[in-house]
Amino acid sequence: MKHNGFEYVDLGLPSGTKWATCNIGAISETDNGLYFPFGGTVGLDSPHYEGNFDSHKLKFNGDIKATLHLDNDAAHIHMGGKWHMPTKEQFEELLDEKNTVSTWIYDYCIREVSGRLFRSRINNETLF
């Protein structure tokens, strides 16, 4: 299934939240994609931010919002449509053991990629 050209998985979560199958800037579920500071919209190849955060277009200075405005939302800027960065509540729903079973995988699909695999207790769909 796709929205605005990007694939997603429906884990059957109570909220109806659909999760993208890969990270922003990634071409597959096993690709790291880009890294963003909170509220940043310019992706970086490394998770390490050296120097001045201004150079990374970090827009917050002490006024951290629980939900980003769309002009500060990397997912919305890069993927468009209704895509947005997950909220705290969406992460909590994903992590809730009533909804999913999660396992840390060290060599996913024999691609030397580690990460967490979520399997829905509702419809058995998976998200890596």
Each predicted region: which residue ranges?
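Conserved positions within compact, well-structured domain cores
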Residues: 1-128
